Amino acid sequence: LNTITPPEDGSTTDSAQAQNFGWSHKICEPGVSSTRSTTAKYLFVGAPGYESDTGQIYMYEWGIGADGSTYDTWTECLTITSADPGQGKRFGHRLQANDTGNILAVSSVSPGNAGKVEIFRRTSQSNDDSTQHAFTLVQTLTGISTDGSSLNTAFGDSLTMSKDGTT
């Protein structure tokens, strides 16, 4: 059993509780990779309270533990931030990913606005049994209420995605 907490690298003074670390989360298991001998697994953890409710997503990869041979450790490999960050936007309020972890939808829902959902595509590079993960913003969805305003529609308060990420 592993306990996962946000890194304490000095990048923030926010505690895990203040970050709302774990507010949203998703595990993806893409299958056997040609560059590794075991099935890859990814864990995405939302922290919408990070840095005065700016928010961010932590990505972890299931990997080899201290003994050097057993896969038993989640290791942080990336943080994902909004393309339009700002205090109070709460990026990471909800998140959803397809089964492979290649497509990620992340909502920002701050009080009094319509909210938005940012869609990211993984653009990782693999070589020599090592992978550098990256995500690129491909689309931003916003909510509009029936009266045409963008107030209080709570767009992105709930997310779902198909296994392949096309819907």
Regions found by a protein language model. Give the residues of each.
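Conserved beta-strand/short-helix segments
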Residues: 1-167
